[in-house]
A protein has these predicted regions:
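Short acidic, gly/pro-rich beta-turn/loop elements at beta-sheet edges
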Residues: 53-54, 188, 215
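C-terminal accessory domains and tails appended to enzymatic cores
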Residues: 2-8, 88-89, 107-145, 173, ...
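Hydrophobic alpha-helical membrane context
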Residues: 31-33, 172, 191-192, 232
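Residues that form or immediately flank small-molecule/cofactor binding pockets and catalytic motifs
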Residues: 48, 97-99, 183, 209, ...
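Short, flexible loop segments at boundaries between secondary-structure elements
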Residues: 174-195
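Acidic, Ser/Thr-rich peripheral helices and adjacent loops at domain boundaries
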Residues: 61-67, 193-202
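Active-site beta-strand->loop->alpha-helix modules in alpha/beta enzyme cores, enriched
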Residues: 1-167
Length: 261
């Protein structure tokens, strides 16, 4: 029988969110249900730094797809995130590191010069990037002192998700890893569980209120929907189907340990 994650065992849960929407997308129901039970939930957004002009061509294309300009993109996304986290009942910490499309080398050239370059299933993570992320996350964890840390598994291979996932593995804390939405829904990621062979998930069976809060929280990130979903008109149904498959017919979110076999 798949073990259930007992939320009342924790006074404070920290959710490491690579970007401003990842926490609500991947574990918004757990956040809402934990908050309802009196648990202090802190969402730490790692990559929400402003781009330094000139903005790369891939970053400008991304902004345009989301309906933003190069100047207002992060401000608009933070407003959406504040609304989303208010819906699910989390407080927020932000580390203001630049996300992949904004990062540059010492000569001012983009580190990732195409949309596909940020997906690194086979490429080696940069030591400098990892060191910066690891240091900032460790400092925040020490300040908040959570009983449990939730971090991304890195499904989909987005370099920012992988950096946060690897940094979390180096924490001297109890860490569980969430399934990265929307990537876990993508056909190209269907074999992600091959990398978790021998590991058993913990399951959070969502309350109706928790699931509703998750969906409402995701809706707050309206500018991102055109880039998140293969089928923007059916994402609610697609997410519901996946959640019910994860929970044996009941809506559920799953969390994995990298240590128990």
């Amino acid at each position: 029988m798949t073990p259930v994650l007992p939320l009342t065992d924790f006074a404070t849960i920290m959710v490491l969110s690579p970007h401003l929407d990842d926490s609500v997308l991947s574990c918004g129901a757990l956040i809402a249900d934990a908050h309802h039970l009196g648990v202090d939930v802190v969402v730490v957004t790692v990559f929400n730094g402003r781009p330094v002009p000139p903005v790369s061509a891939p970053a400008s294309r991304f902004h345009a797809r989301c309906g933003h300009t190069d100047d207002n993109a992060m401000d608009e996304r933070e407003i959406e995130d504040a609304h989303a986290l208010g819906v699910v009942g989390a407080r927020t910490e932000r580390l203001y590191l630049p996300e992949a499309l904004y990062r540059k080398d010492q000569d001012g050239k983009p580190l990732y010069d195409s949309d596909l370059a940020i997906f690194m299933e086979t490429l080696r993570l940069s030591d400098d990037e990892l060191r910066a992320v690891e240091c900032r996350i460790a400092e925040c964890v020490d300040d908040v002192d959570p009983d449990l840390v939730l971090a991304p598994l890195g499904i989909g291979g987005h370099v920012d998700h992988l950096l946060v996932s690897v940094a979390a593995q180096r924490l001297d804390r109890d860490v569980l890893y969430y399934e990265d939405v929307p990537y876990v829904l993508y056909e190209r990621c269907k074999n992600w569980r091959d990398g978790m062979a021998g590991h058993a998930p913990r399951v959070h069976v969502c309350t109706a209120e928790g699931w509703s809060a998750k969906v409402s929280g995701i809706e707050c990130h309206r500018s991102q929907h055109s880039v998140l979903w293969y089928s923007p008109d059916t994402w609610r149904e697609d997410l519901d189907s996946y959640a019910r498959a994860s929970g044996g017919g009941r809506q559920a979110e799953r969390f994995w340990s990298r240590h128990d076999r």
